[in-house]
């Protein structure tokens, strides 16, 4: 078997995350696209940490002939909130992502409206704006600088993920991240403090929203 889908098959949703704990949450959070299930399928890809790892993983996942060649892509997992008042467990839906290089272009997320509505309808605290990329863990004064430059949150993989997805062909892209630490709630290590546990629970709860978004992309009136 080559793994190549039939030409008339709808592509599965590709959810990209960096960490094993993120992949665990996203795979445990709802229907996983198992054989025999109705509805669109989902592939959860662990890219590894950092922008270079994300770019490599996406290039391989979206290569010609792969099952996910034409897939819409969501970058998900945890992030650091930059705005005062953000708390662990808040959700960030990117209006655009921008890489860590000074002249990096923005990747707009034009299909994020249904995600915003569905997450808010679930009673989650949702922030929307620029999701900035970094190649290292951002703390202290650097966070304040990124926020002053217009970003609402930062992580290491979303911008690289969506940039690689768009480079591989036109497709819907989105970035949905859960705040694991924020200016007033800095996290020392994921899973060891209350904020990390709260963020994990929220991340686990958002997968049904991703399914709904994927289904909306398949509607004939789009």
Predicted regions, residues:
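Short polar catalytic/cofactor-binding loops
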Residues: 18-22
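Glycine-rich phosphate- or other oxyanion-binding loops that anchor nucleotides, phosphorylated ligands
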Residues: 24-222
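Extreme N-terminus of proteins, especially the signal/transit-peptide cleavage junction
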Residues: 2-11, 67
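Intrinsically disordered, low-complexity regions
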Residues: 15-16, 77
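Extreme N-terminal starter segment of soluble prokaryotic enzymes
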Residues: 8-14, 42, 71
């Amino acid at each position: 078997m080559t793994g190549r889908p039939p030409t008339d098959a709808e592509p599965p949703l590709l959810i990209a995350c960096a960490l094993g704990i993120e992949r665990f949450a996203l795979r445990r959070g709802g229907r996983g696209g198992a054989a025999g299930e109705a509805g669109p399928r989902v592939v959860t890809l662990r890219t590894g940490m950092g922008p270079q790892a994300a770019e490599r993983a996406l290039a391989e996942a979206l290569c010609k002939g792969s099952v996910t060649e034409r897939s819409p892509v969501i970058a998900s997992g945890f992030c650091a909130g930059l705005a005062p008042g953000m708390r662990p467990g808040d959700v960030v839906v990117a209006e655009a992502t921008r890489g860590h290089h000074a002249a990096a272009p923005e990747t707009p997320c034009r299909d994020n409206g249904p995600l915003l509505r569905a997450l808010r309808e679930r009673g989650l605290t949702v922030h929307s704006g620029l999701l900035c990329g970094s190649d290292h863990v951002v703390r202290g004064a650097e966070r304040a600088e990124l926020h002053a430059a217009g970003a609402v949150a930062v992580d290491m993989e979303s911008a690289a993920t969506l940039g690689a997805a768009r480079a591989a062909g036109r497709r819907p892209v989105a970035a949905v991240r859960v705040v694991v630490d924020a200016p007033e709630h800095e996290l020392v290590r994921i899973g060891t403090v209350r904020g990390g546990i709260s963020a994990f629970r929220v991340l686990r709860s958002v997968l049904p929203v991703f399914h709904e978004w994927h289904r909306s992309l398949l509607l004939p009136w789009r």
